[in-house]
């Protein structure tokens, strides 16, 4: 399944803001470049599973929880 890039970035941005983290702090915790995180959140780049895993751990979330949020965001655009 291919996710829409914006549907991937938005839940990451929301989770980051819920935790009160800046992009600089989250990217540091996740071990990725801030510019990479910015591109993911803006929907300009699609992260691989390893990056999603790193971001989830940095957000103190289970990777499955972050993936579920991404899936939920993706399904918002699918008509019933």
Regions found by a protein language model. Name each.
Residues 1-18:
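A short, Lys/Arg-rich alpha-helix, primarily the initiator
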Residues 57, 65-80:
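Short, charged recognition helix plus adjacent turn
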Residues 44-54, 63:
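Short, basic-rich loop-to-helix N-cap that marks the start of a DNA-contacting helix
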């Amino acid at each position: 399944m291919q996710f829409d890039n914006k549907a991937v970035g938005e839940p990451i941005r929301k989770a980051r803001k819920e935790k009160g983290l800046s992009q600089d702090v989250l990217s540091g915790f996740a071990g990725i470049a801030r510019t990479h995180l910015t591109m993911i959140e803006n929907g300009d780049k699609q992260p691989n599973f390893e990056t999603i895993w790193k971001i989830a751990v940095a957000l103190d979330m289970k990777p499955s929880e972050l993936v579920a949020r991404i899936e939920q965001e993706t399904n918002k655009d699918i008509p019933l």
